[in-house]
UniProtKB/Swiss-Prot annotation:
GO biological process, any: respiratory electron transport chain
Subunit organization: NDH-1 is composed of 13 different subunits. Subunits NuoA, H, J, K, L, M, N constitute the membrane sector of the complex.
Gene3D superfamilies, sorted: 1.10.287.3510
Superkingdom as given in the UniProt entry: Bacteria
Name of the protein: NADH-quinone oxidoreductase subunit K
Length: 100
């Protein structure tokens, strides 16, 4: 069994990597990937904590987080596909330009 500290440290590292990818990258697809990494890191923290205390709540929260991530990914990818068809670019700077 993995100790609680090791699992939570791994989840924190994954969360920081996802947050870094979300903040630094200017491509919307990579920002979506960073958000997915952050969701998976929080799900990992739930599973590790639930395993440590012998509760099944962590696994239930993992299923909830995975279903949330799947819904977010499908909607996000559909929006990115439409944006790419309209602008031929997924750069956040070109998307934020206002028409006027």
């Amino acid at each position: 069994m993995i100790p609680l500290q090791h699992g939570l440290i791994l989840a924190a590292i994954l969360f920081v990597l996802g947050l870094t990818g979300l903040v630094i990258r200017r491509n919307l697809l990579f920002m979506l990937i960073g958000l997915e990494i952050m969701i998976n890191a929080s799900a990992l923290a739930f599973v590790v904590a639930g395993s440590y205390w012998g509760q099944t709540d962590g696994q239930v929260m993992y299923i909830l987080a995975i279903s949330l991530a799947a819904a977010e990914a499908s909607i996000g990818l559909a929006l990115l596909l439409q944006l790419h068809r309209r602008r031929q670019n997924l750069n956040i700077d070109s998307v934020s330009e206002m028409r006027g």
